[in-house]
Curated annotation (Swiss-Prot):
Coiled coil regions, renumbered to chain: 245-271
Biased composition regions of type Low complexity, renumbered to the chain: 48-57
The protein's name: Mediator of RNA polymerase II transcription subunit 17
Species the sequence originates in: Eremothecium gossypii (strain ATCC 10895 / CBS 109.51 / FGSC 9923 / NRRL Y-1056)
Gene it is expressed from: SRB4
Family: Belongs to the Mediator complex subunit 17 family.
UniProt keyword annotations, A-Z: Activator, Coiled coil, Nucleus, Transcription, Transcription regulation
InterPro entries registered for this protein in UniProt: Mediator_Med17
Entry-linked PANTHER family: MEDIATOR OF RNA POLYMERASE II TRANSCRIPTION SUBUNIT 17 (PTHR13114:SF7)
Presence of the UniProt keyword Kinase in the record: no
Top-level taxonomy: Eukaryota, Fungi, Dikarya, Ascomycota, Saccharomycotina
GO biological process: cellular response to heat; positive regulation of transcription elongation by RNA polymerase II; positive regulation of transcription initiation by RNA polymerase II; regulation of transcription by RNA polymerase II
Subunit and partners: Component of the Mediator complex.
Length: 639
């Protein structure tokens, strides 16, 4: 047929374009523009449009057998099994499972498709309307295979990369890597072949075996392209520039070396002065080690002034001080460190306390006490400031930590001595009370009042107070030495050691005072019950018998410690006194006053007749019982 009014008329034998009824199959409207062949392959709608244009412009072939009147999708989808059709529908609707398809959604899609269907027609210019490129890409149905129908189709995810695209990208990356490797290998081979003509050993060593077999060595050469010669002016200018750069570099190096030399010289002077001060003030007997200052965060030298290495068990103070170099004053500072995390450094007010012994004597008429003795400061240098002398500061710190440990051990021992007249007034004072006397051990600050008390006139018991204080300090040293000896000996017991057993500070002093009072009372009882009644009777105090030392050690250090500790055996031994009362021809009464814990009194009485035969041998703990027993002996056996 011929064109009519600018429009192309189609032959009936070749078929006419029709619009498929969407009720034939429940697919999206965009799928209507695409045709699916019987073998499952897809044909783009754009290609059909192109073929229709070619039909309108070219003569139409009269062959009705080669062209089908209607390409019906129902022939493919209608006869498709459900196990293939359902996954296809789910994929086209972006659904993950068949249960997500509801009747309301299907009705809504049908209504939207009925409103949005566009029939393909001819425009006034004879062209056929075509869809967008993006729409055409969506109209291509996928090829249906058995593997795809059996597998569960997952919903499309725009952010995820398909496996095929990922494999394609992987292949491209590998191709680029192989290409770069080949190019670098080719460059290396080229350089090796070029180098083999100049330096054969180096070139042949870097050539690959394939290149050695394929190309002879030294077969590639290169020529040097000479630069145009410079004239005299350019040569002179270049020489001047080179010399200028060299001179400038030399001047910069000179200035840099001079600056660094000045810094090193200054640092060397500071270090020399620092170590000179340390060697001047620190002796070989001081324990010096490295530690980090928690206040400055720098590593510094520290001095250990505590007595832990000497056997001390005092844990309240580490006994460590940091040597800090004050750059402003150019001097060393000794700063003690506390165990507490809150307080890093100990102030002078908290450490400068020393022990003082006060002796008060009771006034019988007024029932009051008067100060009759006070210990003095044995080292007068403690009262003088020593901010610049590190050795004196170390000596002061050693003295004060020893005094604090002494008070700590006194308070620890006084807990078990409260039944015998020992009590606390505050954390810095321990009081020992005895008949007619009161002894106070107090930690007092080192201030002007301590200095003024040293100039007061001497009292009656000042010497006795000093002796008691010296005795306490010596006994603390004995405790340290016993701890050292225990550390040198092998452990023979699995039981945990208790230091309370060797804590003998107040007990020897209190034991001597109480034993003296007990002895006076016993003498008074014997005088009243025996001497005043029996004529010609007398009493005498027998000399004490010395006990031989039974400690022998083969090891030299242990033997030396035993010898040093043995010097205090007489003080540490429990007090014991023997009294002999002579009754003339009636016999002898021997009384032995001893103690089991330094503080109590045990009285042993032995009465022997004139023939030396022991008549009574008994022990008393009460003076009233002793008095009654002496009355019994005198009345029954003497008179």
């Amino acid at each position: 047929m011929e064109p009519d009014d600018g429009h192309n008329s189609l032959n009936q034998d070749n078929g006419i374009p029709i619009v498929l009824d969407p009720n034939l199959i429940n697919l999206r409207s965009r799928a209507a523009s695409a045709t699916v062949t019987t073998n499952g392959t897809t044909a783009d709608s754009s290609e059909d449009s192109g073929s229709q244009q070619s039909v309108s412009s070219a003569p139409i072939q009269q062959n009705s057998e080669e062209h089908s009147l209607v390409s019906n999708p129902y022939e493919t989808y209608g006869r498709m099994p459900l196990q293939k059709l359902i996954p296809l529908i789910l994929q086209m609707r972006n659904a993950s499972s068949f249960s997500e398809l509801t009747e309301e959604d299907l009705l809504r899609d049908i209504e939207r498709e009925e409103k949005g269907i566009l029939t393909t027609g001819l425009d006034v210019e004879g062209d056929i309307e075509m869809g967008d490129a993006d729409e055409e890409s969506d109209l291509k149905p996928q090829e249906i295979t058995d593997d795809d129908s059996n597998a569960r189709l997952k919903p499309n995810n725009d952010s995820a990369i398909p496996q095929e695209e990922f494999n394609q990208m992987k292949r491209e990356v590998l191709e680029h890597i192989n290409l770069a490797l080949n190019e670098s290998s080719l460059s290396l081979e080229f350089i090796s072949l070029l180098l083999s003509s100049v330096r054969p050993s180096v070139g042949v060593g870097s050539m690959s075996p394939f290149l050695k077999r394929s190309v002879p060595t030294a077969s590639l050469n290169a020529d040097k392209v000479e630069l145009p010669p410079k004239n005299k002016t350019e040569t002179l200018t270049l020489a001047v520039i080179n010399r200028g750069w060299k001179l400038r570099s030399l001047e910069d190096s000179k200035a840099l070396l001079k600056e660094n030399y000045a810094k090193l010289q200054k640092s060397l002077e500071v270090e020399h002065a620092h170590w000179a001060m340390i060697s001047q003030h620190i002796s070989s007997t001081d324990v010096v080690f490295k530690m980090r200052d928690r206040q400055t965060g720098k590593r510094s030298l520290a001095v250990k002034y505590g007595y832990e290495d000497s056997g001390s068990l005092y844990k309240q103070d580490r006994g460590v001080a940091v040597l800090r170099h004050n750059m402003d004053l150019n001097k060393l500072e000794l700063v003690p460190i506390s165990n507490s995390k809150e307080e890093v450094h100990i102030t002078a007010n908290s450490v400068e306390r020393f022990m003082r012994v006060h002796i008060y004597t009771k006034i019988e008429e007024e029932d009051d006490y008067i100060l009759s003795g006070e210990s003095s400061i044995d080292d007068q240098s403690l009262l003088q400031p020593c901010h610049d002398d590190i050795s004196r500061q170390i000596a002061r710190l050693k003295f004060f930590i020893f005094e604090r440990e002494l008070m700590y051990q006194l308070k620890k021992e006084a807990v078990s001595l409260m039944p015998y007249g020992v009590n606390f007034e505050n954390e810095n004072k321990v009081v020992l009370e005895s008949p007619g006397e009161r002894i106070e051990f107090e930690m007092v600050p080192l201030d002007d009042s301590a200095l003024l008390s040293t100039h007061e006139p001497r009292r009656v018991n000042d010497k006795r107070a000093n002796i008691i204080l010296i005795l306490l300090r010596m006994l603390l040293v004995v405790i340290h030495k016993k701890q050292l000896r225990r550390g040198l000996k092998p452990a023979t017991s699995k039981h945990k050691y208790r230091a309370d057993g060797d804590l003998l500070l107040l007990r020897p002093v209190l034991g001597r005072i109480r034993h003296r009072n007990y002895l006076q009372v016993v003498k008074r009882v014997v005088t009243e019950c025996v001497l005043n009644i029996v004529p010609g009777s007398s009493i005498e105090l027998l000399p004490q018998r010395s006990e031989p030392d039974t400690l022998h050690a083969r090891e030299a250090n242990i033997a030396s410690l035993n010898k040093q500790i043995g010097l205090f055996d007489k003080i540490l031994r429990m007090p014991r006194s023997e009294l002999r009362t002579s009754l003339g021809a009636k016999g002898v009464i021997d009384l032995t006053l001893k103690s089991s814990n330094y503080c109590n009194a045990i009285i042993q009485v032995i009465y022997a007749d004139s023939a030396g035969k022991t008549v009574f041998d008994t022990v008393f703990t009460e003076l009233k019982e002793l008095e009654e027993f002496l009355h019994f002996i005198v009345s029954e056996y003497v008179l």
